[in-house]
């Protein structure tokens, strides 16, 4: 290949990845997001990034880059559609069916409470998720990789008005977008090591109604001295926080035979303290409970008297929350049966037990701390490629993913449970453009029914849910890979 032609093809490859990095990222379904291209989705992630010339190794297992024999740029766009429905009941702190007492613009309560009888509508979402990888061999021993990935992301959106879920969750969104650089070294012809760094931008958004009168009725500060009703008015709290953090990852790859490849990878836990702002969109009654100092309460607001040390500002204040990215360990195996059929299997352990609670702080004080007590999980996957013709490759796979949630602390923000993935995919080499391959995949998620026995913290009003969420999801993935 002459130098001019090489430079042109290199420019095309860089443009593919550069165009992706310059685009906006979007939220995908699930707290933990698979970081593969369409070929990986088609195999349900079986074999990880150990298949021949898979550029997703740049993030998933950088050691595998040492066995990639050409420059590769890859762009994937995923379309995710997640559906969630709640069915069940909600109760106030007394155990009565949940209600709300409307108030007018002057803070005057209505004549009667209104039942909260809505089930929150459709809690799911649709989204587009771009992912990109690039691998460049430096010589016969070293290779360098770049990627843009979304390792963490989840979203739920429930109705606010008349909803049984309004005191537990309205909108929730967590997204982490990372840019990575990695390097691999082939120690021997059958063994390689690799490692890399990730710089990630995390954003979090949560909102829910604050049941201030219910919280006052349960408060230690007032000691039950006043018989407050539950659910008076509307006080929608919105919290938006973000952070930039740095982490690292590493991996090893061993080829014990000319047909087998084994890989082990580790992605370290990343400390992630997010900071931002909160606002409370309160009616006249709620605003008064947060701002008006009452002589009979020691010249404190109702909120301050109910929970000493707690201050809420309806016009907003600074906020912070810590949501660390858990460590993972992945073990992958790929076996080449013949020149047409290749099979892969994987296991992924995630240290979700590091996520114990979600604590919101402001100006040195804890507004609320919600326990989650997640447990460590395993994901098992099996998938493969069948080269149907010299240009067409067919793929299929199945995976089982354990949930980190517990029945005792699961809530509508993340109503997760164990799930199965089933996937189909294809790859086609474009004859008119040598080096260009188009891949596609369809993946369906079957999620076990999630029970919700959530009890709110006292300072959130002490409401209780008794119901279940049924969820299902599907992902359509399309990618372009250019080798040069």
Regions found by a protein language model. Name each.
Residues 45-54, 83-125:
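Surface-exposed strand-loop-strand hairpins of Gram-negative outer-membrane beta-barrel proteins
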Residues 27-44, 48, 98-100, 104-109, ...:
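Outer-membrane beta-barrel porins/channels
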Residues 67, 74, 79-83, 122-126, ...:
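Generic, well-ordered alpha-helical segments
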Residues 42, 57-64, 74, 479:
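Residue-level detector of alpha-helical secondary structure
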Residues 32-47, 66-85:
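Transmembrane beta-strand segments of Gram-negative outer membrane beta-barrel proteins
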Residues 64, 72, 77-83, 88-90, ...:
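Short glycine-rich, polar/acidic loop-and-turn segments at beta strand-coil junctions
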Residues 1-27:
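Gram-negative bacterial Sec-dependent N-terminal signal peptides
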Residues 50-52, 58-71, 134-139, 153:
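Outer-membrane beta-barrel pore proteins
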């Amino acid at each position: 290949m002459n130098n001019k032609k090489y430079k042109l093809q290199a420019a095309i490859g860089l443009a593919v990845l550069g165009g992706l990095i310059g685009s906006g990222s979007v939220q995908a379904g699930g707290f933990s997001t698979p970081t593969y291209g369409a070929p990986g989705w088609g195999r349900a992630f079986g074999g990880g990034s150990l298949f021949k010339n898979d550029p997703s190794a740049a993030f998933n297992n950088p050691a595998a880059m040492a066995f990639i024999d050409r420059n590769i740029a890859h762009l994937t766009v995923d379309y995710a559609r997640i559906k969630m429905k709640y069915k069940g009941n909600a109760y106030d702190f007394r155990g009565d069916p949940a209600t709300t007492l409307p108030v007018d613009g002057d803070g005057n309560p209505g004549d009667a409470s209104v039942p909260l009888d809505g089930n929150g509508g459709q809690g799911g979402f649709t989204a587009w998720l771009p992912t990109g990888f690039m691998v460049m061999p430096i010589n016969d021993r070293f290779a360098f990789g770049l990627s843009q990935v979304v390792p963490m992301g989840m979203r739920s959106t429930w109705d606010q008005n008349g909803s049984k879920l309004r005191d537990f969750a309205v909108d929730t969104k967590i997204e982490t977008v990372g840019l990575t650089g990695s390097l691999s070294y082939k120690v021997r012809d059958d063994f390689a090591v690799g490692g890399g760094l990730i710089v990630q931008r995390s954003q979090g958004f949560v909102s829910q109604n604050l049941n201030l009168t219910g919280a006052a009725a349960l408060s230690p500060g007032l000691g039950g001295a006043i018989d407050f009703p539950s659910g008076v008015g509307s006080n929608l709290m919105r919290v938006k926080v973000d952070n930039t953090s740095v982490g690292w990852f590493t991996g090893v790859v061993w080829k014990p035979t000319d047909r087998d490849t084994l890989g082990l990878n580790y992605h370290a836990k990343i400390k992630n303290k997010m900071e931002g702002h909160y606002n409370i969109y309160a009616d006249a009654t709620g605003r008064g409970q947060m701002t008006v100092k009452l002589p009979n309460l020691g010249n404190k607001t109702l909120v301050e008297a109910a929970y000493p040390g707690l201050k809420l500002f309806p016009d907003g204040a600074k906020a912070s929350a810590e949501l660390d990215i858990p460590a993972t360990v992945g073990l992958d195996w790929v076996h080449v049966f013949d020149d047409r059929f290749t099979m892969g299997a994987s296991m992924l352990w995630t240290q979700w037990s590091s996520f114990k609670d979600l604590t919101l702080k402001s100006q040195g004080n804890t507004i609320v701390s919600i326990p989650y007590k997640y447990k460590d999980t395993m994901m098992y996957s099996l998938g493969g490629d069948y080269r149907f013709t010299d240009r067409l490759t067919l793929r299929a796979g199945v995976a089982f993913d354990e949930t980190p949630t517990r029945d005792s602390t699961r809530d509508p923000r993340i109503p997760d449970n164990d799930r199965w993935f089933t996937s189909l995919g294809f790859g086609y080499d474009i004859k008119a453009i040598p080096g260009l391959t188009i891949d596609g995949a369809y993946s369906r998620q079957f999620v076990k029914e999630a029970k919700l026995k959530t009890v709110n913290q006292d300072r959130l009003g002490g409401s209780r849910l008794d119901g279940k969420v049924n969820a299902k999801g599907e992902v359509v993935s399309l990618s372009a890979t250019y080798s040069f």
